[in-house]
């Protein structure tokens, strides 16, 4: 799987960036994943976006457990949707679906960190590896 994670909004605090980098490093054994923070939605490279299956992270999106997220990843792989764009903090891009980390509003850095942690957890589940529950 190839993931691009785009976060749009204010700059992300260093401690969140450090946590995201750590999860990126851990995820590299399961998938290819990149993270880019854009100050505003107009900076998004729209010409590249069309080839991706687009998932938005929104408070109003569908709630998933860690196991359900793992199953969603498996379904995407089986349906040959291997280029995934995950967008945090932007509702202007047409999405294929949206999921929720929480119905509460949270900072862009926290939402991004939680997303990376949950992706890591999902891959540990898919590979039958232990992970704290």
UniProtKB/Swiss-Prot annotation:
Domain of life: Bacteria
Catalysed reactions listed for this entry: pseudouridine(1915) in 23S rRNA + S-adenosyl-L-methionine = N(3)-methylpseudouridine(1915) in 23S rRNA + S-adenosyl-L-homocysteine + H(+)
Main location: cytoplasm
Keyword rRNA processing belongs to the record: yes
Cellular component terms (Gene Ontology): cytoplasm
EC number: 2.1.1.177
Keyword Cytoplasm among UniProt keywords: yes
Keywords attached to this entry: Cytoplasm, Methyltransferase, rRNA processing, S-adenosyl-L-methionine, Transferase
Coiled coil (UniProt feature): none
GO MF annotation list: rRNA (pseudouridine-N3-)-methyltransferase activity
Binding site for S-adenosyl-L-methionine: 55, 89, 101-106
Family to which the UniProt record says this protein belongs: Belongs to the RNA methyltransferase RlmH family.
Role noted for this protein: Specifically methylates the pseudouridine at position 1915 (m3Psi1915) in 23S rRNA.
Protein name: Ribosomal RNA large subunit methyltransferase H 2
Organism: Thermoanaerobacter pseudethanolicus (strain ATCC 33223 / 39E) (Clostridium thermohydrosulfuricum)
């Amino acid at each position: 799987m190839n993931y691009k994670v785009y976060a749009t909004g204010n700059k992300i605090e260093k401690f969140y960036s450090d946590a995201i980098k750590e999860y990126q490093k851990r995820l590299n054994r399961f998938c290819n994943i990149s993270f880019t923070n854009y100050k505003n939605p107009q900076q998004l490279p729209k010409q590249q976006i069309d080839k991706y299956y687009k998932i938005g992270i929104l408070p109003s999106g569908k709630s998933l457990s860690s196991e359900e997220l793992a199953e969603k990843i498996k379904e995407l792989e089986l349906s040959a949707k291997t280029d995934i764009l995950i967008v945090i903090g932007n509702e202007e891009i047409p999405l294929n679906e949206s999921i929720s980390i929480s119905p509460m509003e949270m900072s862009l850095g926290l939402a991004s960190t939680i997303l990376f942690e949950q992706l890591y957890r999902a891959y540990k589940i898919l590979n039958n590896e232990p992970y704290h529950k």
